[in-house]
């Protein structure tokens, strides 16, 4: 079956820029990627076709050869042997891994010695109370992970033996295959890219060099952390392959809601109830802080919702910047479950203080009802 023109495959003109080619490739690769089309062989074929077209058209030398000779430049026996296409010479994800890596994070290694892979990073979600987050705390945690095998010291080989250099790739982890004018690297099928072969594997880790284990760690949480902060423990992630460096452990902080305080940055907020008599006459009210109780002076004629700032009673920031404040909102409480005598006294108070002739005692009401009157007067004009 004749091969489609590479420009047609990507849906671009022959004078398209490299940027346009790359843009078209990304769109089509996402559309036909096997992970999105599991079990669809036609999508897999289109995905491979798109990758090959992109690899040729973004390489100046290959593109020039294709523009001059077309598909014949890469056909087996046509110009140097080897082909770019075909059904089964290895995994196309390995052949063009570096091309596709910018989208899916892949990519092939260079031509040097194969390197063992660094261990994966891990994440641990830690929940703290507000007090723990503000003051700092040490916590013991248990983390399931992969650790270096203590029997073979991570080599994967049985005691008295060692891993042997792969005879196929000579330790490089890759082999070359010819494609027309060009040589393309592919993951070694013998050692799977590791560069070494373990002929006598360790019985404990079965040649992997790592084993599953739950580690117990003591984590020191600095004072002032907040939800979203992340603490890095270097080298406490999964062990690397065959002696490679371990990954890191990231402790993700989440601070639980508090029944009194709310936090915003380094400031704390709370509501404190006061009686309506204290709000009218003034006095002192006890206010909770993270360091204990303190007294707040309430001026006379205080209205509900009034805010007071208590400097230095907030949180000391984990990144510096000083200590925040405690913002106190006073809420005037309406008395409930009154006795007959209390109700009688309030009615007397209402007559002397809150009647129509006593508007000076209720400034908010006077302003409100005056505004309402003006509103309706304007409507009737």
Curated annotation (Swiss-Prot):
Pfam family, one: DnaJ_C
InterPro entries the record matches: DnaJ (IPR012724), DnaJ_C (IPR002939), DnaJ_domain (IPR001623), DnaJ_domain_CS (IPR018253), HSP40/DnaJ_pept-bd (IPR008971), HSP_DnaJ_Cys-rich_dom (IPR001305), HSP_DnaJ_Cys-rich_dom_sf (IPR036410), J_dom_sf (IPR036869)
SUPFAM superfamilies the record matches: Chaperone J-domain, DnaJ/Hsp40 cysteine-rich domain, HSP40/DnaJ peptide-binding domain
Keyword Transit peptide appears in the UniProt entry: no
Assigned keywords, A-Z: Chaperone, Cytoplasm, DNA replication, Metal-binding, Repeat, Stress response, Zinc, Zinc-finger
Signal peptide feature range: none
Record's cofactor remark: Binds 2 Zn(2+) ions per monomer.
HAMAP family named among the record's database cross-references: DnaJ (MF_01152)
This protein's name: Chaperone protein DnaJ
Organism field: Vibrio atlanticus (strain LGP32)
């Amino acid at each position: 079956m004749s091969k489609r023109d590479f420009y047609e495959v990507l849906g671009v003109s022959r004078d398209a820029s490299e940027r346009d080619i790359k843009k078209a490739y990304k769109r089509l690769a996402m559309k036909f990627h096997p992970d999105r089309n599991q079990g669809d062989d036609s999508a897999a074929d289109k995905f491979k076709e798109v990758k090959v077209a992109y690899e040729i058209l973004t390489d100046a030398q290959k593109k020039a050869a294709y523009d001059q000779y077309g598909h014949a430049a890469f056909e087996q026996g046509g110009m140097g042997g080897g082909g770019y296409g075909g059904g089964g010479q290895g995994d196309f994800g390995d052949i063009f891994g570096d091309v596709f890596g910018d989208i899916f994070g892949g990519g092939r290694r260079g031509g040097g010695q194969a390197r063992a892979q660094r261990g994966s990073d891990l994440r641990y979600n830690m929940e703290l109370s507000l007090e723990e987050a503000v003051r700092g705390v040490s916590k013991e945690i248990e983390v399931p992970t992969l650790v270096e095998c203590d029997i073979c010291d991570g080599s994967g080989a049985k005691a008295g033996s060692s891993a042997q250099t792969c005879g196929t790739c000579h330790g490089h982890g890759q082999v070359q295959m010819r494609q027309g004018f060009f040589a393309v690297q592919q993951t070694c099928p013998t050692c799977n890219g590791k560069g070494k072969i373990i002929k006598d594997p360790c019985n404990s880790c079965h040649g992997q060099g790592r084993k599953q284990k739950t580690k117990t760690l003591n984590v020191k949480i600095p004072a002032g952390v907040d939800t979203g902060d992340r603490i890095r423990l270097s080298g406490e992630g999964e062990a690397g392959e065959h002696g490679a460096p371990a990954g890191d452990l990231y402790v993700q902080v989440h601070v639980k809601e508090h029944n009194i305080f709310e936090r915003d940055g380094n400031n704390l907020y709370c509501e404190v109830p006061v009686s309506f008599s204290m709000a009218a006459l003034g006095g002192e009210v006890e206010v909770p802080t993270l360091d204990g109780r303190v007294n707040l002076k309430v001026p006379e004629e205080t209205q509900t919702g009034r805010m007071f700032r208590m400097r230095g009673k907030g949180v000391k920031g984990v990144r510096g910047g000083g200590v925040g404040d405690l913002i106190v909102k006073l809420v005037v409480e309406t008395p409930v479950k009154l006795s007959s005598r209390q109700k009688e006294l309030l009615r007397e108070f209402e007559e002397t203080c809150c009647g129509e002739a006593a508007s000076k005692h209720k400034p908010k009401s006077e302003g409100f009802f005056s505004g309402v009157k003006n509103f309706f007067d304007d409507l009737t004009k």
